[in-house]
Amino acid sequence: MEKIIVTLENHFDQVWRRCFKRNIENDGYTYISYEKIEEMYIDRCIEIAEKRPEFRFQIETAVVVDNYLHNHPEKKEVLRRLYDRKQLRVMDSGYYITDSNMIGIESFITDFLLSDRFLKDVFGEVSAVVTRRDAFGNSAQLPQVFRDLGKKSIAAISYSRVYGDVWRGIDGSAVCVKQPTFAGGAGGWKKLVPCPECKGKGCKKCDYTGVDRERERKEWWNLTVYPERILADEVTTITMGCEELTPAESLVDEVNALKSKYPIEFGFNEDYLPYIEDINAKLDCGDFSGLSVHPSFQVNFNNTGCYVSRIKTKQRLIETENTVSDLEVLAAKKYVSTGEAPDFSEIYKHYLFGAFHDSIAGTMVDAAYDEIMAAYDSLSGKIEAVSARLTDKTESSEKYFFNGLPIKRNAVVYMGCPNGKNIEISGEGVKTLGCDGKIATVLVENIEPYGARVFKITEADNKSAKATETAEKVAFHGTVLNGADEGTKFSGGEKRVIGNLRYAVTINGNGVESIYDKILRKTVCAVGAFSPFEHVLETDIGSPWTTLENYFNKTRLRDYTRLIGVTEKSGYAHAEFRTAIPNSMSGESNDNVIEWKIALIDGVDEILYSSRVEWHNFNRRLKVAFPATGNGEAFYSAPGAVIPAEKYEPYFSWSGATGDYPAYRFAAVEADGYVATVFNAGTPSFGVEKSNDGAVMFVSILRSPTVPTYLHEPQSYTMKAWDGMRDNGSHEFRLALKTYEKRSADIVLDAEAFAHSLAVIDGAAANAELPIVKDGKAVITRVKPAYDGDGIIVRLIDENGDGDETTISLPAWVKSIKLTDVAENEKRDLPTSGKTLTLTFRPFEIKTLKLKRGK
């Protein structure tokens, strides 16, 4: 055999069965934080390494090192010394091992830039090896990002099997995934148990750690070697590690004892790089001859219940992504004006905690969920403070709507009403369309790219507003068919048509009957197996990770829906409905109610859906149906790319995939001469079912799993504070339906505009022009100050895969342009003559530019 590399590395979660920085108190026991467990691992490894020079260990993520050094700054030189002696390496998994299906491509890139800059600062270099261990899927643009970051190997991909030597992304970029043969291991899956003496509080018996150290030593598996896997002409690996257990010095003796039989030593994943140099040399030249290529451009699907479990983990992340993006644009404007820009590192670390794979997936105990929500709450104050430094506040009561996107648009904004009072929002091109004392619906017309609009908030006369609203409402109550535990059904009621300049929507007492597109001149949605915007209750027996049983009984809720009222004004109409889910469909739990409406606004070519849901259910999933009149290809937006909904065979296991797709911004289906598209804002779970009547798109907005899976491991410990996985309580959702003549890049822009609402800021943004797309299909996904303070970063992606030229405007302040990689390393100069720059994109290509000011 060539060599046996022994790697030691624990997998470190930030949240899951524990909190990151908080202890959990439950039933009289204390469960220590992951932070403390990670410290125990590093301290133990340092202790062994200082005594045994042949010992080597890895740390999985930058956040673990950063957090450790924050708490123990005196250990920085110790870690550096071990690194220089080749006893320590830190894998490049990003700052956190994030999800890659439900977060924006810019969040994914930022996570790696944050990691790489931190590791370079501490250790002077960054690993060329990536790990995606335990991430629930890998999307289509990752190979391109990894290649641009200079990564040479992916050492671990979990749950979905990767086949072959190479994974080729949707743009054609590829990364090596070949790994040495697994020949043995040591470690253990069991978790640290609270000390029985002190119940986790910390005492002399447990060395004040709060865990049962004696049991921990017994749980560690001894080294096991599989001789039949050690081949004469190959490099093999022995992998040691756990999630919580810490290694013992005896491991070194066990490895040394094998040296008489094998060429074996402790090492790192990077030690395999010389053995795949030939593969990487071919990839550098775009040569795939003789290489085995993974059959898909993504490594999905698994754990598909994560797309909807604990839905606020998805919604809060999307909101925060948008807010941080707006902040970066404000900072870019400030930089152009003053040459100064804030450091966003701490904000990035804070918000990307919510992008960690178990965070956004919703696969955690209740206390960890609370920690994530609290982190978002505390981040709001930090963002407000930075925003105040980037804007100029006036003495008046004026506020500003700010458009953080590079497109001109009509934008609908929903603003909360203070103290339940009706409010009026006014300003040039600003209209208050309606206010119910909870939410004011506002239309901001023709706001420029990166532009702002002044507005004022005044309190409306509640009495007169209520009287006007009552006069405009006409309630249609159907006929009650039955009641009691089986619920109240409604039937009948007049038909009525409401609409805007684009759509005519026929409604009745039970919901929406049909939708007619006035531009395409055809009915694009109609009642069939399901009604447009109908809520559907589906049996879903599973865990937060996935549905576990192949039983999907769907119950239409149309008959349990009644029309509450219709409001029509000049240029605006909406219909309000109430759907009450019967107790018999909710585990005899009452108060499962959906209050929802559809709104149509002149100047907004979408049918807007919003809902408030009171949810108290068990083993159920709530979906919204969108029937189309054709059975063409389904496709959806992944981070940074529009991709087809690849057919896959559902499978049912603890990490299974049961038919859904992660639609980051939109899902669509090609119908009868048109494309029906559904936009979302943090509800990515999308499925499509086809029949002779046409395709029905379903967007899942809630689920209530009751199987805790690995949240409950009696062989480790029992801590049952995970009932929140059923997502009990109040929720709010927004969706939109829009139809197109054909698939185009316009869908990408419209979906982004729907999900990314206007920001509300207290001061004026700096008066500085930023680049926009003048012509072409690529879209600008990021504008921000360069990390080195020497320019503005502009990233463009051909998300729709058109592969054509795109022209951007060049503001007068631009004196030079550099093409860079995603890490902002300059590659070459680009021309600056004239007022525009034209770039040629291959399909799905990512390009990063640095625009520099004059001296």
Feature map (PLM): residue ranges:
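Short, solvent-exposed turn/loop segments enriched in Gly/Ser/Thr/Pro and often Arg
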Residues: 58-67, 94-96, 130-139, 157-161, ...
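CE4/NodB-like, metal-dependent polysaccharide N-deacetylase domain
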Residues: 108-141, 148, 219-239
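C-terminal (or distal) subdomains of carbohydrate-active enzymes
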Residues: 142-145, 179, 191-199, 203-204, ...
